[in-house]
Regions:
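Vicinal oxygen chelate
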Residues: 1-57
Length: 57
């Protein structure tokens, strides 16, 4: 599993979906240290689970 930090997880969801990429959760969950997180479906990332995380304000 790989985690990448993004500035705006909601914008990332929109951009991914507009590009035809499936995310596992449309609504971010609160992860470690309060980060908002989503996951990209592994079928779009060569079998790797990719997490996108937005730092808490």
């Amino acid at each position: 599993h790989v985690c990448l930090e993004v500035d705006d997880v909601y914008q990332a969801i929109i951009e991914l979906k507009d590009s035809g990429v499936e995310v596992l959760n449309d609504i971010p969950k609160i992860g470690a240290e309060g980060f908002k997180v989503i996951f990209i479906h592994p079928k779009f990332t060569g079998g790797v689970l990719v997490e996108l995380a937005e730092r808490p304000a």
